[in-house]
From Swiss-Prot:
It catalyses: alpha,alpha-trehalose + phosphate = alpha-D-glucose + alpha-D-glucose 1-phosphate. Activity abolished by 1 mM Cu(2+). 0.1 mM Cu(2+) reduces trehalose phosphorolysis to 76% and trehalose synthesis to 48% of maximum activity. 1 mM Zn(2+) abolishes trehalose synthesis, and reduces trehalose phosphorolysis to 40% of maximum activity. Unaffected by EDTA. SUPFAM superfamilies: UDP-Glycosyltransferase/glycogen phosphorylase. This is Trehalose phosphorylase. Keywords: Carbohydrate metabolism, Glucose metabolism, Glycosyltransferase, Transferase. Reversibly catalyzes the synthesis and degradation of trehalose from glucose and alpha-D-glucose 1-phosphate. The equilibrium lies in the direction of trehalose synthesis. It comes from Grifola frondosa (Maitake). One of its GO terms (molecular function) is alpha,alpha-trehalose phosphorylase (configuration-retaining) activity. InterPro entries: Glyco_trans_1, Trehalose_Metab_GTase, TreT_GT1. One of its GO terms (biological process) is trehalose metabolic process. Belongs to the glycosyltransferase group 1 family. Glycosyltransferase 4 subfamily.
Length: 732
């Protein structure tokens, strides 16, 4: 091994002072904005000195050049693997933290070698949860290999179902002939004449750093990867390791939920059951977020699950968005589903479906054992599947509100769209809806109807805890975005702000948010010092299939400058890039949150805010009332009652004891059902019942989580948080 080597680059104290902004005197415990430079790292390790020490090398990269490297040794005890892993993890994290603070940088990603991961199995988990670094694992060997990625030589990735998509063929080892270095006559008898070319640990670390950067795209976000047959390669096909320590998932739920998950996963693995999800987009919307999280969790459980999306079509997405708005009752009354649009929609889904039903596809014989179909973009698949595989269980999942009162009005746009969709949906084995009043038309047989809320992941970028260093990086990034678009900037941390995070959609009640804020400002006169009045932040990022966002965004800005010009300098309106941690930070640093949707599905963003300890003021629409306990974790108002919203805003902002009590209650009373683990348990239960046990469920409007907990022998315990099971009239 080479002698230990320390980082050589020296940070500039002048630049450090210039970039660091002053900490607010009113809130000295919160760091100010700091401009941090994005960086990447490569981390490698190897046992050295006759198994007595472990060498760790770290290479620093700025996306163009290798800028620095360090290597050091730590004691090695092969007989104490857990203690040894802890030593390596601590050393790596301390080294990266020290470099970050000294050089004013933020590590976004790190390449980790398989050899190192074997010695420290939870290193990736710690990098992700403790330092907000995306860890990407590479099988970098301690000797040189010859890449087969050449012209006319194709890498192939598996087209079979499964949560792991291999990344290519094994590369051959490069050997050299010792005769090239010395006289072969001087070699002893029986000595191997072809030897591998060794690769030092620092070379391995540098290789890992360079490979890691290739997985990041515009905006420094990990690239979305789609495999053959449009299988979504979640976490870069398994190369990104966010959570290797499954115990981290266990900590997010109660004992009953976790015991149920383990029992279900054991049965699915034993029976080798393959699960398939089919939805319209691989990123940008709530459904996509849930699918990424659930596939990641299933991979950790070693449950065989895969997720497929169709080829995107802008013309079809315009049709599906129109259908969505029509069903929710927020579209222009003159907007209708034309025959031309319906035919285009049908041909699009048929074309994609034929790829999946063809030999070797996920919906062909030998493919998935159960199919979960998401939302009104995909029901055209259902009759096609039934023709090819009539015995395959098909579960339809509806994530949106369907205005059952309008659906049954003869000749209405809602009736036309619903009849078109129901013609396909009726062939499914089960219809799953949000547990919300009047979300399901009466056409759906009650025996086929089951209830399940939406979910979010407490360990992904949207909801995990971010420390102050990472938080200030994302707040700085948001400031830069505002400057770039010439938008008002947040005064945080000197000034508080109130936030609504939602898509720019006609149903999100954004005009009501602005009006409520204006009323709140008037109430603040003589009650709150002018410098202490909070700002308003409206932000969100959109789905791939949402063409309305720009239209609504423009309308919001026009409204502010026309009707609320007095308060315009204190209102920040931003369409954010697709960075989960950015939205996480904006929520975590807000005083409290609003969610004034006029029509809504479940809107799990409410639970994300509560989980972060942020009281929420929201409207009684969709699934929002299920998540907020009025007067305890937030306030519920009628849609359009902006005066009541403003008064609650004033109470929360001026009564510190009330705020602290609500914040703590919100943080500690979020149900397992709205997290990935509880949600995954419901899907696993359906797979076990339909496939493993051959039971065709007749839920009659029951909650899937209730059926699952009863079947697993893990009934809800007294005091266990869960969504209210009051009188629901889901069908209208």
């Amino acid at each position: 091994m080479a002698p230990p080597h320390q980082f050589q680059s020296k940070p500039s104290d002048v630049i450090r002072r210039r970039l660091s902004s002053a900490v607010s005197s009113k809130r000295p415990n919160i760091p100010g904005y700091t401009s941090l430079t994005p960086m990447w790292a490569g981390i490698a390790g190897a046992v050295v000195n006759n198994n007595t020490q472990f060498e760790v090398a770290i290479s620093i990269h700025d996306s163009v050049y290798n800028t620095d490297f360090a290597s050091s040794v730590v004691p090695y005890s092969p007989n104490e693997p857990e203690a040894q892993a802890g030593i390596i993890e601590k050393h790596v994290l301390e080294t990266l933290r020290k470099f970050s603070t000294e050089h004013m940088c933020k590590f976004l990603g790190a390449g980790v070698t398989v050899i190192l991961l074997r010695e420290a199995p939870n290193l990736c988990t710690r990098l992700w949860l403790d330092m907000d670094i995306v860890p990407i694992v590479f099988n970098i060997k301690p000797f040189h290999t010859d890449s087969i990625t050449r012209p006319n030589v194709r890498h192939r990735i598996s087209s079979t179902t499964g949560s792991y998509v291999p990344s290519g063929a094994e590369t051959p080892t490069v050997y050299y002939d010792p005769a090239q270095l010395q006289d072969p006559n001087k070699l002893s008898a029986n000595v191997q004449t072809r030897l591998p070319i060794p690769r030092t640990v620092d070379e391995q670390a540098d290789s890992a750093a360079r490979k890691c950067i290739m997985y990041f795209g515009p905006g420094n976000n990990p690239r979305l990867q789609i495999g053959p047959r449009n299988q979504v390669a979640v976490d870069a096909g398994g190369k990104i390791h966010l959570i290797d320590d499954i115990d981290e998932y266990r900590k997010t739920v109660g004992k009953g939920t976790w015991n149920s998950v383990i029992k279900l996963a054991d049965e699915l693995r034993e029976k080798k059951i393959k699960i398939g999800f089919f939805s319209s987009t691989p990123q940008g919307g709530g459904v996509a977020l849930m699918r990424h999280a659930i596939i990641r969790f299933f991979t950790a459980l070693d449950v065989d699950a895969a997720w497929y999306v169709p080829n995107p079509s802008p013309s079809v997405f315009r049709t599906t968005k129109n259908n969505h708005n029509i069903l929710q009752g927020v579209a222009d009354p003159s907007l209708r589903l034309t025959k031309e649009a319906a035919d285009n929609f049908d041909s699009w889904i048929l074309k994609n479906g034929l790829r999946w039903t063809a030999e070797g596809g996920p919906l062909a014989p030998g493919g998935v054992d159960i199919a979960f179909i998401d939302d009104p973009q995909m029901p055209g698949l259902i009759p096609l599947i039934k023709r090819i595989r009539p015995d395959l269980p098909i579960i339809y999942r509806s994530h949106i509100e369907i205005r059952s009162d309008l659906v049954h009005v003869k000749g209405s746009p809602q009736e036309e769209v619903w009849n078109y969709l129901w013609n396909n949906i009726q062939h499914s084995d089960l219809f799953i809806s949000h547990p919300v009043n009047k979300f399901v038309p009466s056409d759906v047989p009650l025996e086929k109807l089951a209830l399940l809320g939406a979910a979010t992941d407490w360990l992904d970028g949207l909801s995990k805890h971010l420390d102050a260093w990472d938080s200030q990086y994302y707040m700085g990034e948001f400031r830069n975005l505002c400057v770039k678009e010439k938008m008002n900037e947040l005064g945080w941390p000197a000034r508080e702000y109130i936030v609504q995070i939602a898509r720019f959609d006609p149903s999100k009640g954004i005009p009501n948010v602005i009006d409520s804020y204006a009323r709140f400002r008037k109430l603040c006169v003589d009650k709150v010092m002018e410098d202490d009045i909070p700002q308003l932040l409206l932000c969100g990022h959109g789905a791939v299939d949402d063409p309305d966002a720009s239209i609504i965004y423009d309308q919001v800005l026009q409204l502010i400058h026309a009707k609320y010009k007095e308060y315009a300098p204190d209102i920040v309106v931003m369409r954010c890039p697709p960075s989960d941690q950015l939205l996480n930070t904006l929520m975590a640093n807000a005083k409290f949150a609003l969610q004034l949707s006029t029509r809504e599905g479940f809107e799990v963003k409410v639970s994300e805010a509560l989980h972060a300890g942020k009281p929420v003021i929201a409207c009684r629409t969709g699934g929002i009332p299920l998540q907020i306990e009025h007067g305890k974790s937030g306030y519920l108002c009628e849609p359009g009652d902006n005066a009541a919203v403003a008064q609650h805003m004033l109470d929360l902002y001026t009564d510190e004891d009330l705020y602290d009590t609500m914040s703590e209650y919100a943080r500690t009373h979020v149900s397992d059902e709205v997290g990935t683990v509880g949600n995954a348990a419901a899907w696993m239960y359906l797979a076990v019942m339909y496939v493993s046990r051959g039971v065709k469920l007749r839920p009659h409007g029951a909650w899937i989580n209730d059926l699952m907990r009863t079947e697993m022998g893990e009934p809800y315990r007294p005091g266990e948080p869960r969504l209210p099971r009051g009188e629901l009239h889901v069908q209208g």
